[in-house]
Every structure is written in structure tokens, then in C-alpha cells.
């Protein structure tokens, strides 16, 4: 698909459940890869307390954004060839809530989506 992945390491370490946080990151990246067109870009950056995954994919309509974390909600993804169960972001929200972290999403159709993982609700930086 020839997608550019731009990853900016912070060099910071946060104490959290690595397995479940990795699950969330993988799910969000999977969505970004699915909905980013050939030649697109996915950026991963943050400051240690926040991780941002942003793409320049097809985006999500404003009326669908409030519901993307609901179980089974798929919304209109604009592409019939992209099947979705509507369970991925729901599970991400459940995991982040259990870890006492936050997850939010902003998007513009035709411009892409930005998912913010807020680890600052309960976190400690490791020096």
C-alpha cells in the first residue's frame, strides 16, 4: 500500500499495562492502515503522557464521531470494500477505561483521523 509511517520516539517510559496498551495501539493502527489510501501517511507522536496516532485517510463524518466507541457501531466509512464489525474502538475504550486512561478521536472527512491516548489520568514517568 506504500503508506509512510512517521514515528517520533520521546525516550520516556510510562508505567502501565504494556500488553493492553499495545492492544489499543495495534487496533488504532489497524484502523489507520485500513482507511488510509495508497501513498498516505500515518504519524505516531506524543509527550509520554499522551500518544497520538494521526492519519490522512478517509476520515469520519461528524455525526458518526460521537458513536465510534459504541459496541457494534460502524457508521458510514465511505468504502464498501472496507468491512467493519464495530467492535475494535469499543474494545479500545473499554481497555483504556480499565487502565484509568482516556481515548478520544477527532476527524474530518477526506482529511483523516486523529486518535489521542491520554495516559495522564493515572501514570508515573520512569526516569
Predicted regions and their residues:
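Short beta-strand/loop element within the Bergerat-fold HATPase_c
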Residues: 39-50
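Conserved glycine-rich
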Residues: 101-103
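Glycine-rich ATP-lid/hinge loop adjacent to the conserved G-boxes
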Residues: 73-83
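Short conserved segment of the HATPase_c
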Residues: 60-73
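Conserved micro-motifs of the catalytic ATP-binding
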Residues: 9, 13-16
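Short helix-loop "hinge" at the ATP-lid/N-box region of the Bergerat-fold HATPase_c
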Residues: 32-33
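Acidic ATP/Mg2+-coordinating residue in the GHKL
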Residues: 55
Amino acid at each position: 500500500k506504500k503508506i509512510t509511517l512517521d514515528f517520533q520516539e520521546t525516550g520516556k517510559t510510562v508505567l502501565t499495562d504494556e500488553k493492553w496498551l499495545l492492544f489499543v495501539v495495534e487496533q488504532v493502527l489497524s484502523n489507520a492502515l485500513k482507511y488510509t489510501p495508497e501513498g498516505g501517511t500515518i504519524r505516531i507522536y506524543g509527550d509520554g503522557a499522551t500518544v497520538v496516532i494521526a492519519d490522512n485517510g478517509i476520515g469520519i463524518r461528524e455525526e458518526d464521531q460521537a458513536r465510534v466507541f459504541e459496541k457494534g457501531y460502524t457508521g458510514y466509512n465511505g468504502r464498501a470494500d472496507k468491512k467493519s464489525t464495530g467492535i475494535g474502538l469499543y474494545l479500545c475504550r473499554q481497555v483504556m477505561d480499565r487502565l484509568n486512561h482516556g481515548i478520544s478521536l477527532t476527524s474530518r472527512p477526506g482529511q483523516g483521523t486523529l486518535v489521542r491516548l491520554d495516559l495522564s489520568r493515572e501514570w508515573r514517568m520512569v526516569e
